[in-house]
UniProtKB/Swiss-Prot annotation:
It catalyses: L-seryl-[protein] + ATP = O-phospho-L-seryl-[protein] + ADP + H(+); L-threonyl-[protein] + ATP = O-phospho-L-threonyl-[protein] + ADP + H(+). In the C-terminal section; belongs to the protein kinase superfamily. Ser/Thr protein kinase family. In the N-terminal section; belongs to the leguminous lectin family. Residues 328-691 are cytoplasmic. The keyword 4Fe-4S does not apply. Its EC number is 2.7.11.1. It comes from Arabidopsis thaliana (Mouse-ear cress). The active site is at residue 491. This is Lectin-domain containing receptor kinase VI.4. GO terms for biological process: abscisic acid-activated signaling pathway; seed germination. Involved in negative regulation of abscisic acid response in seed germination.
């Protein structure tokens, strides 16, 4: 009797130990590259079977059949250490095929399922997909979660239309979340739709993160060659906590319908992982998967001669349509042939013309926010994101406009700085050339600097002017010294400075900009820019440099302080005027009188001194933008301005006449027109080299 009691006690201890081990098993991992030889690990019911080459076939094309297949062991998905009902993180990936058929539209679809039991013998076919039936659909006692891959639309409405969508279902086959079958392209984040019933392998990644209750689902054809970065569905699913019980079975269910709405459903490979904060299902090696099934239709009882006649007629008609299509495409290509340039390949962020057309309401006049020498700027609204953009439409048949178009893409397209306008992309449609920028709401600096009080209610404040000046200096420093190449802007002026909603300046319009490798010399031979902002050495050699940008900044700085344009009349030049006031001890007379006493005298004197220093007639005596910014930030003292800063009236007149003569000469005009005869053939090499 005592020995029997000991045996009972020992068995009880062993049972409790085993139960404890079972409750502490919290991770499950498996991977199947095909299912041949794994029959014992897959619990199958209904029409499901494993084919001779290792495919898991859930259903064939027979009408009104159901097939289910679950992993043979339950998976622990509730966190037993938590006081709350917390679903553990899990991850799964599988590759499936639904062969297409010439005699059927397919149906009804299949699901990936979490179920408290692998036995779904009471489930119905058609829209219930072998998971539920008409009596229990929607019951909270089901404790079923499913991702449905539906090829027939019209659940419970009796229409049974052709469908192609993915849904998230909780205790019901009526989806809480539903999306058309698609993936997001990694190149341009565009959504690309595709068909489930295609006969090609399709891969699914399903990841659930327990702490955040977030579910991500990605689906794409394996021919894509990569997993898209953006999931098709990314949602919080708090409902899952009410669905999942301690142990769940994971697997698949599928069903077909009547009246030709039937498909075969195959799973080629499957991996799963649960437990831990970020479990990750093992990657499936496509090379190890069994071959896909043949894409053939189920035989029907049609007369062979009738079928042969239909096939023959269809073939003839198809050939004629293909030939007609090829002829039309050839004719259209001959009319609108477009050859991709190097710069188009290197800078692929291309907008679709129809999107820009919609964004600007057909480029209406009431959308115009500005005009330039070579184009018109429109305000646009991207409907998909509610973002505002600025669209610059280059004047058609303008060769210099085409030069600016390509130059902006090759320079501004790669520059990123808080004080530069951000170029989002470009568009080339027939003879239309368009550049797309961030929309800057406050317009250009000149419109604020010279605005009438009735427009803005007040003149531009001194604090705003000084901060704008420092912001422009910061942007030029980035161009000259901080980017990978040296960028010479060549057209620094108020109309090319845009002011954002926080009154920060953004230097833009890089149509005349040139890029150089560090250590190389500028080799431009054409005088470009705006009268009043061009450095005097341009009249001698036409050679732009960072020093000529510094000169233009100096003029702009004096203009910001004085509120006066650099060349109000034929003999007036702002730097000469400020220098004369400096020499006579009346430098404060240069400050914009509209400011009254609302300015900082120390900052004003500093800005005027830096402006004069930048306007030195000798380029080698002008400071680098690094020093300009240090002066404005008062990190360095500004050198004293000497009497020999300027040049005599005779030398100034001589240089001015040379500059005007140079701009109007044959040399300048011929250099401007040195382009290809085609508007779409502009060499990027010549632009980068500075010609």
């Amino acid at each position: 009797m005592g020995r029997a009691k000991s045996m009972v006690s020992l068995l009880l201890v062993l049972f409790l130990v085993r139960a404890h081990v079972a409750t502490t098993e919290t991770t499950t991992e498996f991977i199947f590259h095909g299912f041949k030889g794994n029959q014992s690990e897959i619990h199958m019911q209904g029409d499901s079977t494993i084919t001779s080459n290792g495919l898991l076939r859930l259903t064939d094309r027979n009408s009104d059949v159901v097939g289910t297949a679950f992993y043979h062991k339950p998976v622990r998905l509730l966190d037993s250490n938590s006081t709350n009902t917390t679903v553990r993180s899990f991850s799964t990936s599988f590759i499936f095929i639904i062969p297409s058929s010439s005699t059927s539209n397919g149906g009804f679809g299949f699901t990936f399922t979490l179920s408290p039991t692998p036995n779904r013998t009471d489930a119905d076919p058609e829209q219930y997909m072998g998971l539920l039936n008409e009596r229990n659909d929607g019951n909270s006692s089901n404790h079923v979660f499913a991702v449905e891959f539906d090829t027939v639309q019209g659940f419970k409405d009796g229409t049974n239309r052709i469908g192609n969508h993915i849904g998230l279902n909780f205790n019901s086959l009526s989806s809480d979340v539903q999306e058309p079958v698609a993936y997001f392209n990694n190149n341009d984040s565009q959504k690309e739709e595709f068909q489930l019933v295609s006969g090609e392998p399709i891969q699914v990644f399903l990841d659930y993160h327990g702490p955040t209750k977030t579910l991500n689902l990605t689906v794409y054809p394996t021919r894509l060659g990569y997993k898209p970065r953006i999931p098709l569905i990314s949602r919080e699913v708090p409902k899952l906590s009410d669905i999942v019980v301690d142990e769940m079975f994971v697997g698949f269910t599928a069903a077909t319908g009547r009246h030709g709405q039937s498909s075969a459903h195959y799973v080629m490979g499957w991996s799963f992982a649960s437990g831990g904060e970020h479990p990750l299902a093992a990657m499936l090696d496509i090379s190890q998967l069994p071959p896909p099934p043949p894409n053939k239709a189920k035989k029907r009882g049609y007369n062979g001669k009738v079928i042969a006649l239909i096939v023959a007629l269809s073939t003839v008609i198809s050939i004629m349509l293909v030939l007609l299509f090829l002829f039309m495409m050839y004719k259209k290509r001959m009319q609108q042939e477009e050859i991709l340039e190097d710069w188009e390949i290197d800078h692929p962020h291309r907008f679709r013309y129809r999107d820009l057309y919609k964004a600007t309401e057909g480029f209406k006049e009431n959308r115009v926010v500005g005009t330039g020498g070579f184009g018109i700027v429109y305000r646009g609204n991207i409907r998909s994101s509610s973002d505002q953009i600025a669209v610059k439409k280059i004047t058609p048949n303008s060769m210099q406009g085409v030069r600016e178009f390509v130059a902006e893409i090759e320079s501004l397209g790669r520059l990123r700085h808080k004080n530069l306008v951000n170029l989002q992309g470009w568009c080339k449609h027939r003879n239309d050339l368009l550049l797309i920028y961030d929309y800057i709401p406050n317009g250009s600096l000149d419109s604020l600097l010279y605005s009438k009080p009735r427009r803005s209610g007040a003149v531009l404040s001194w604090n705003a002017r000084f901060q704008i000046a420092k912001g422009i200096a910061s942007g030029l420093l980035y161009l000259h010294e901080e980017w990978e190449q040296i960028v010479i802007h060549r057209d620094v002026k108020p109309s090319n400075v845009l002011i954002d909603s926080d009154m920060n300046p953004r230097l833009g319009d890089f149509g005349l900009a040139r890029l150089y490798e560090r250590g190389s010399q500028s080799c431009t031979t054409v005088v470009v820019g705006t009268i009043g902002y061009m450095a005097p050495e341009l009249a001698r050699n036409g050679n732009s440099s960072s020093a000529s940008d510094v000169f233009a900044f100096g003029v702009l700085l004096l203009e910001i302080v004085s509120g006066r344009k650099p060349t109000d009349s034929g003999t007036f030049f702002i730097a000469d005027w400020v220098m004369e006031l400096q020499a006579s001890g009346e430098i404060l007379s240069a400050i914009d009188p509209r400011l009254g006493s609302g300015y900082d005298e120390g900052e004003a004197r500093l800005a005027l001194a830096v402006g004069l220093l930048c306007c030195h007639h000798k380029p080698e005596s002008r400071p680098l933008m690094r020093m300009v910014l240090r002066y404005l930030n008062r990190d360095e003292d500004v050198p004293e301005i000497h009497d020999n800063w300027g040049y005599s009236d005779s030398s100034r007149t001589d240089l001015g006449s040379k500059l005007v003569g140079y701009i109007s000469s044959d040399r300048a005009s011929s250099s401007h027109s040195h382009t290809s005869s085609s508007l779409t053939r502009i060499s990027s090499t010549s632009l980068i080299s500075g010609r």
